[in-house]
Amino acid sequence: WQYRERISESIRSRTPYKNDIAVRVSQVPEFLHKIEQLVGMSYPDFEIVWFGHIGDGNLHLNILKPAELMAEQFKKQCEQVNDSILLVVQEFGGSVSAEHGIGLLKKGQLRFSRSDKEIDSLKLIKAIFDPDGIMNPGKLL
C-alpha cells in the first residue's frame, strides 16, 4: 500500500496534469490503449502515469510535463487534449470524476458523463433543499 500512496509524491516534480476518471473494469485495457494513443498522437513527448483502483475501474491519469516545456505551455496543451480525453470517457460510458466529486473545477466537465436531464435533476434537488442558494454556492449539490 505504501507504494501506491507514494506514487503522487514520486511524480510531483514532473508537474502532473491529473484526471480522476472511471470506466467499467471490463473496458479498462481498451480505454487505456485509446487514451495512450490519443495523447501520444497529439503530444508524443508527454509521458503518462496511470494508477488508481483498477479493481473498480477508477483510474488516475497523470500526464507528466517534459523537462524542456514551460509549465504554462504544458498546462495549455493538456487543456487542449483534455476535452478529447473526456469524449473517450463519454464514448465508454464512464465518469469524469471517479471518486473525488465534481465541485467547481469539474462542473463544466459533467456534461461528458451525465445527460442534460440528469444535470437538471441535480439542480432541482439542490433547489429543493437550498432555495436561496446559500449552501455550497455554485455547486450542483
What are the functions of these language-model segments?
Residues W1-Q2, F51-N58, E99-Q109, G138-L141:
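A glycine-rich phosphate-binding loop feature that marks nucleotide/adenosyl-phosphate handling sites
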Residues L64, L69, L105, S113-S115:
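Generic secondary-structure boundary signal with a strong preference for alpha-helix termini
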Residues Q73-Q77, V81, I102, L110-S113, ...:
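Short amphipathic alpha-helical interaction segments
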Residues W1-Q77, V81-S84, V88, F92:
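C-terminal substrate-recognition/cap domain of FAD-linked oxidoreductases
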Residues N19, L61-I63, H100, I125, ...:
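A structural signal for short, well-ordered beta-strand segments
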Residues K107-L141:
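Activity-critical C-terminal alpha-helical subdomain
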